[in-house]
Amino acid sequence: MRGKIYGAGYEIFIIAFFIGLYFDRTKPLVDDKSKRKRFGHQLMYWGNIEQRGGRHPYGRLREYIFAALIARTDIDLIALDKGDITARSVVDALMDKMEQYANFGFDFMQEKLEEDPNYFFKETAFLRVFTSFLNENKEETDEDDDVPESLD
């Protein structure tokens, strides 16, 4: 994927992450670390721009990413508190989960581009991707509503 199509590299990473998160799908990175790409822009600086050109900083988004990673990563916080595991190992687990969600999201986007090279040039492309999660959740909820609640 060419990042310039989408804007700053970290912005497309955020989108890819949320695609993986909402599909609840991960894809491991390649084992050969020399083939991995780096953005070179630390997470703590993502979205830290001054308002210009109608853009606003989105620091809260980083907080939501962190909260989602804490919720979806298998971490024993009690063991961390007791010192049985290191903070470094927890950070590594969170980073690995974030990268795997994003990796799935990048694959998802690549498939869409292979089907239609102009897919993401449509104004509503990402809106359609993310609203598709709402439709899936509604269908699951509707199916659950058909079954009466147990009186036991």
Model-derived segments and spans:
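Short amphipathic alpha-helical segments and their helix-coil junctions
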Residues: 1-3, 44
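Short, basic amphipathic alpha-helical segments that act as recognition/interaction helices
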Residues: 5-31
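Charged, low-complexity intrinsically disordered terminal regions and linker tails
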Residues: 26-152
